[in-house]
Amino acid sequence: MDEKDEEGEKDEGTGQRPTKQVIVIRRDLRMRRGKEIAQGAHASMAWLRQRVVPHLTPAGVADQVKFSEAERAWLDGSLRKVTVKVGSEAELLAVYDKALEAGVAVHLITDRGLTEFGGTPTRTCLAVGPDYDDRIDPVTGDLELY
């Protein structure tokens, strides 16, 4: 039987609420595989950059960064990521808006277009979270796995 509490389902292995980050990639752009991977990495790291860079000291040490319980659990745990796909910019932006409405961290990536897209800045992907699965799933749970 699954162990649950009032805040949501718990992971059977750790007894903690499961956490993840979901990377949403636009497939209509037909990016090269390496480009897709790089864009997804940019999306994932955008969260960390936003949280840490403002707290860097002149010596380059992140001082006084405060992570939520979910963020700390994700960082201390598996750093689990799930990649899903959408078929258009409109679908990508709909996920972005849905995450904002749900109060879940979301980071939209716009590629500068230097190596693909003919020099045109192009929205390629986004990252939702990290957060608890039960907060992210209402935002991305209906999207197809990549």
Regions from the language model: what does each represent?
Residues 1-146:
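Positively charged, small/polar-rich N-terminal and surface patches that mediate targeting and assembly
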